[in-house]
Amino acid sequence: DNRLVGSEMCIRDSFMSLGVPIYEGYGMTENSAIATGNTPDKVKLGTVGTPQAGTELKLAEDGEILVRHPGVFKGYYKNEEATKEVIDEDGWLYTGDVGEYDGEFLKIVDRKKDIIITSGGKNVSPSEIENNIKTSPFIKEAIVIGDDRKFLSALIGIEYDIVSNWALRKNIAHTTYRNLSENEEVQNLIWDEIQKANEYTSSLQIRKFRMLTKELDHEDGDLTATQKAKRNVIMEKFSDLIEDMYK
């Protein structure tokens, strides 16, 4: 069996190791589903494939992905202003995603609004770094910081049950998420995991981190309904931790 996926970046190697071929695709509601996709006879790992039949694709100067085809939606209901923000007069849909396109295969870099621009003018995709960090079984959440900063840092949320079991084997006493996160040995463990993730980043790497002292919670407004971290909310809520890294 083959599987076509089109959500957040998936961990392809995990599925492949189970003998399940994964073919990534790309699309959005305004695009009427799929714009690009890999197929069994034409696939390139790390990309979301090639444009579907009848679909035109190009990148704007800032790297934003633009698509045009007969299936692009006509506009938002009774909201002409919002429609003009995403569809130009030539019918190109501005997706809000930044990508890399070689004329054949498309690679998604990040959401345009999430791209970090460091004080040195370097554009950084936080989600790519965050996904590398979260491959660690000990780390549940990673929020990369660095917009208009001299270096990258991260806020880290632990995978409580796994870290707790690790701590028990090390005879590290703890009773709450907070005191487990604040334990020096746990923080050393997490730093080692971040260093492993840094090995996959050729240029900018995480230089400092701070531990979140509570689990992120949808009811507290930290997460979306689909359990994605709300970057701006978290950065505001934990601004003291962030500023401490840049003292």
Predicted regions and their residues:
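Conserved C-terminal "lid"/linker of ANL adenylate-forming enzymes
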Residues: 141-143, 150, 191-247
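AMP-binding (ANL) adenylation modules
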Residues: 27, 41, 70-71, 100-101, ...
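Core catalytic subdomain of AMP-forming adenylate-forming
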Residues: 87-103, 119-144
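Conserved ATP-binding/catalytic segment of the ANL
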Residues: 51-118
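Single conserved hydrophobic/aromatic residue that forms the stacking wall/gate
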Residues: 1-6, 10-11
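Residue-level signal for inorganic ion chemistry
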Residues: 15, 57, 104, 133, ...
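Adenylate-forming
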Residues: 72, 105-134, 163-183, 202-204, ...
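Active-site loops of AMP-binding adenylate-forming
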Residues: 15-21, 28-46, 79-82, 160
